[in-house]
Amino acid sequence: MKLKKPVFLYFLLLAGLAASATEYQNTNTDQFPLRIHPNGKHVTDNNGKPFLMVTDVAWQLLRKLTYADVVQYMDIRKSQSFNTFVLQLLPALPNQKNVNKIAPFQDNDINKPNAAYFDYLEKIVIAAKERDLVIGIVVSRKSWNVVFDSKKEDDWKNYGRFVGKRFAKYPNIIWIVSEEEYQSASQFSAIAEGLRISTENNNLVASLSTCSPSNLAHNAANRSDLKFVIPDSTVTFGEYETLTNWQKNSGQLSQQPFLISNSEFPKEITDQSALIRNQAYQSIMSSAAGFCHMSTIKNFYPTWKVNITKDGAEYIHHFVKILKGIPWEYMYPNHTPGLLPDSTDQRQIGTVSLTNNRLSMLYIPESKPVLLDLTKLRGNDFQIVWYSPRTGRRWTGASITSSTGALITPPDAQTGWDWILLVGARE
């Protein structure tokens, strides 16, 4: 039997979150700019409503897509429940131009921006705002080091100030500064400062890493509001392993919101749909602010219009639908040690719980029975609810009594299916 809406509210009432559930239903078009949640782990809209960031990587959008294609891309991703996309402001190489054959600077001098280049970006920002989409704009990149390194701190700051002022009136922008490409933090700090002092809306300023972030403290030299971790084609298998381990511990390590993209080595995988779906839920299990989806669409090859409906994004709508019924923003990883007695399950299954230990959510990457020690949760009687990330369907499971060996079985034994399991105290 499908879980009805009152059961959603039942779980929320148990958790003392009824007010939050009511707030979650409110709609307000004045949702930008985004803010940092008081818990320091997540993002909210401008009204304080939790904002699950569902982000698509669109690195080469400026270089490859005409305006008509940009609009088509946005409309497709919007229909798939994405609310954010990120792009590179600068072309991949200093000798390249945007789709209109315009370079960002005259003579590659960052003090001499080409107005037409930024005019085209503005059209895209406006189109995104009209669709209630957040646009993350990466303003610096490793391949441009030869250009930026020839300048001084004042030049970097002026560049950040110019870009920030040029788009100051648009609250749907998140500025992103690449933080790992430099031997020192000076360029990051100067560009970020220029962006911060020129914005009218206090837009978030984020940082971008392609590997595990090395410093997550609030007082780090590269101070940012939000961290994006998006591997690129140069990341090695070993670095992916390090990134995966970092993600498993990031709920404790990170002191600010973060989004992580595909943290498993994908080069030998033809169909990445299952991997991407797995990564989306593992991100939430790591206490991320959402999920950053990355596929070959980021390069906008000639086949992108065909592939955009089958690149793993077909499951994102279910991802958003499922999480809207769960107080994910109040749940934290590793809060109920011992809930999974089996050591293999501990390695494979992601778990988050409310701090009062009355509700836990588990992501089970394969269809199999799961052994739970319910004495690690608060309560005597528990309600089970299942969700299928593959189909979006939900089931009401059994009511069970607390015990050290509760064996919970998925409602449909489909080979290769993954599952979301909710376990909530009834009393």
Model regions: which residues?
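Non-catalytic accessory regions flanking glycosidase/transglycosidase catalytic cores in CAZymes
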Residues: 21-80, 358, 372, 377-396, ...
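Hydrophobic h-region of N-terminal signal peptides that target proteins for export
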Residues: 12-20
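Sec-dependent N-terminal signal peptides
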Residues: 8-11, 278
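Extracellular glycoside hydrolase catalytic/binding regions
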Residues: 172, 178-311
